[in-house]
Amino acid sequence: MPIRLHIFVSSARHAINSSALICRFIAFHLSPLLIHLSYFLIIDVLGFVALVVLRPSNHKYNPRYIDMFFLSTSAVTVTGLATTQMEDLSSSQIAVLTLLMFLGSEMFLSFLGLVLESSKQNKHDPENRRVSSVTVCEQSHLEEAIPQTPSMNSTDIKRSCHKYLVFVVLAYMIIILVTGSLLVFMYIAHVSSARDVLTRKSINKALFSISVTVSSFTNGGLLPTNESMAVFSSNNGLLLLLIGQILAGSTLLPMFLRLVIWALRGLRLAKAEEPDFMMNNSSSVGFSHLLPNLQTIFLAAVEVAFVGMTVILFCCLNWDSAVFAGLTSLQKITNALFMAVSARQAGENSIDCSLVAPAALVLFMVMMYTPSLTKLFSACQDHKQIGPESDDRTSKGKPFLKTMAFSPLAFNTTVIMLVCITERRSISTDPLNFSTFNIIFEVISAYGNIGLSTGYSCSRQLQHQDGIACHEKPYSFSGWWSEPGKLILVLAMLYGRLNSKDSTSARTR
């Protein structure tokens, strides 16, 4: 038995070392675009296989392969669109989707980028691994040289900052996820209205707490409930908890990172050089989410102002409509705040988007299409750091995939046209549900990796097919599309995720 155990341990160690060597070779020799594409496709396929192998909780439900592949892609690209009823899935399938959202999140990929960059610096740093020469000196010279300690140069500080950032980002993710899950679980345990919803739906409280926290922090948007957060529209405390988690993983991440670094410097948990250098020279560190102090303050102020204006506009357009039916004034404001924050990143909805005023839907669509201020600031900082001469060299040496890639506007226009072609029969027979606006809204939501959807309503059908009853299905509008239409939307989700990642990867590669 010990011999077999030794053989197993040796084989496992050899497999891990081989995998590490392969990953390092891929990371150091392939372009970032191909690395990201390969990563998303591999995780997507593995998630699809896991979802197919695991059986749903509803034994009468037999999911189609296209729906499982769509769901896996939606989780990996942190989009949040669903073509199946989430409550039909088993707890193990929900756990797989939660893991996929975490592995595909911007935060985790940024963490991997820091780890690879730190490994690359150690690999190309021969000074730390060998002595170039040995000089023989006299005893008097040696005694004079002993008390002298050379100071760290800029390269050493940057290398040390990368290692320090790996620890900071890892600790940040663990703290937010663990604390967020515990707070959500405690809220559900003490508030009967929220607890009764999960009991009625037979959803495990611990699994829901972890899943909703990961979904909010990673901006994934997939929740174990069919109605997303709409069933908790009256629970102000839960919505406010998730608002904080969404902001901590998206637009206010640069501010929270600087606060964590500032707190660690105050607690003296590291040398003074690393936190001071990162706080004063954040652009030199090369981490896209660590912005200079002035830009971080401006980002937080603009985000607060933008969310505030969105809440005011949303309330003015929908205050007395069916969107807020049965809610108090405080609950209406809380739901408007949740939608203003979620429509920018997470895609979790606490209200029925099909009932929202058209002007507010147009605003949501613009918010989903435009990149966040964090990405814009990162791109501007990247342009200043690279310079025009490097831009000319980069443009001349662009890979073929980048040269031939569609612009976002051209790509989305093409996708909308293709979807209109594949769904032309439904457009002619069911024009209210399959309206051009609803199709555009769904495509923009997929491209922006948000996940908001207008859904489908049987009450809007103009023609009822004989012998076929229409049943309300609480999932995304794309769940009613044909298989070619779903595959086209899968491409839109992947393209949007790659376009978003490629635009912010320059500083971390």
Swiss-Prot record:
Highest taxon, organism lineage: Eukaryota
Entry keyword annotation includes DNA repair: no
Reaction equation(s) it catalyzes: K(+)(in) = K(+)(out); Mg(2+)(in) = Mg(2+)(out); Ca(2+)(in) = Ca(2+)(out)
GO biological process: potassium ion transmembrane transport
Record membrane topology: Multi-pass membrane protein
One Gene Ontology molecular-function label: potassium ion transmembrane transporter activity
Cell compartment(s), UniProt: Cell membrane
One Pfam family linked to the record: TrkH
Keywords of the record: Cell membrane, Ion transport, Membrane, Transmembrane, Transmembrane helix, Transport
Tissue: Expressed in spikelets, leaf blades, leaf sheaths, internodes, nodes, the base of stems and roots.
InterPro entries assigned to the protein according to its UniProt record, in alphabetical order: Cat_transpt (IPR003445), TrkH_K-transport (IPR051143)
Ranges that cross the membrane: 33-53, 96-116, 165-185, 237-257, 297-317, 353-373, 401-421, 476-496
Annotated GO CC locations: plasma membrane
Stretches assigned to the Cytoplasmic side: 1-32, 117-164, 258-296, 374-400, 497-509
Family assignment from sequence similarity: Belongs to the TrkH potassium transport family. HKT (TC 2.A.38.3) subfamily.
Notes concerning its domains: HKT transporters are proposed to contain 4 pore-forming regions enclosed by transmembrane segments with each containing a potassium channel-like selectivity filter motif.
General function of this protein: High-affinity potassium transporter that does not show potassium-sodium cotransport. Potassium transport seems to be independent of sodium. Mediates transport of the divalent cations magnesium and calcium in the absence of competing potassium ions. Selectivity for potassium is dominant over divalent cations, and magnesium and calcium transport may be small and may depend on competing potassium concentrations.
Protein's UniProt name: Cation transporter HKT2;4
Gene name, Swiss-Prot/TrEMBL: HKT2;4
